[in-house]
From Swiss-Prot:
Residue ranges constituting the EngB-type G domain according to the UniProt record: 27-201
Residue sites binding GTP per the record: 35-42, 62-66, 80-83, 147-150, 180-182
Cofactor: Mg(2+)
PROSITE patterns: G_ENGB
Function: Necessary for normal cell division and for the maintenance of normal septation.
SUPFAM superfamilies: P-loop containing nucleoside triphosphate hydrolases
Highest rank taxon of the organism: Bacteria
Gene: engB
Biological processes annotated in GO: division septum assembly
UniProtKB keywords: Cell cycle, Cell division, GTP-binding, Magnesium, Metal-binding, Nucleotide-binding, Septation
One Gene Ontology cellular component: cytosol
Pfam families linked: MMR_HSR1
The name this protein goes by in its record: Probable GTP-binding protein EngB
Length: 217
């Protein structure tokens, strides 16, 4: 397989949806970003794409209640899933979000990979582990980003990284763990490389359509 280098700076917003029934057709390739409400998910997407406001960051955790789709090129999408685990959100709404997350991860056929973001100081909370379990159960590879890595000194950062790598072994899945910081750009290259690898497995018919469109210009 040839690894393509995608230009994530060209990423643009497509649609917001409350559940998978309101998403575009289940085709092409999607990589989803998931994490607790204060894990830095929106900041990571903005850093990856070089766009300060592509994914809205909020001072109030839990504001992202919809599935947000962004297109890199035709047939290649990044998906910002609702943040989870915020204590002040009503229980009924929490359950609704969790159902939407589980349904997306288990039923969306074009989902190629899952990026789970966790604060490096508080990794692998119950809901983080649930996301990993759902992904592994359907054979979806996972990248765990330990965010806010700049908050720890180098030694403590490496210790947390090694601890999480050991802790995820029992999940028996295709899981890569990296330290990440939107502020200091730590781990951004590794995220980009992983996305390029996943997206390079895009179905041939989509690649042909894209090539034909460019030839016709």
């Amino acid at each position: 397989m040839t690894i393509r280098n995608f230009n994530y700076h060209m990423t643009h917003f497509v649609i917001s949806a409350p559940d998978i029934r309101h998403l575009p057709r289940d085709e092409g390739i999607e990589v989803a970003f998931a994490g607790r409400s204060n894990a830095g998910k929106s900041s990571a997407l903005n850093t990856l794409t070089g766009q300060k406001s592509l994914a809205r960051t909020s001072k109030t955790p839990g504001r992202t209640q919809l599935i947000n789709l962004f297109e890199v090129v035709e047939g290649v999408r990044l998906v910002d899933l609702p943040g989870y685990g915020y204590a002040e959100v009503p229980e009924e709404m929490k359950l609704k979000w969790q159902r939407a997350l589980g349904e997306y991860l288990q039923k969306r056929n074009c989902l190629k990979g899952l990026v789970v973001l966790m604060d490096i100081r508080h990794p692998l909370k119950d809901l983080d582990q649930q996301m990993i379990t759902w992904a592994v159960a359907v054979g979806t590879p996972v990248m765990l980003l330990l965010t806010k890595a700049d908050k720890l000194a180098s030694g403590a950062r490496k210790a947390q990284l090694n601890m999480v790598r050991e802790a995820i072994i029992p999940f028996m899945g295709d899981i890569q763990v990296e330290a990440f910081s939107s502020l200091k750009k730590i781990g951004v290259d590794k995220l980009r490389e992983k996305l390029d690898t996943w997206f390079s497995e895009i179905p041939p018919e989509v690649m042909i359509d894209e090539y034909d469109d460019e030839e016709g210009k």
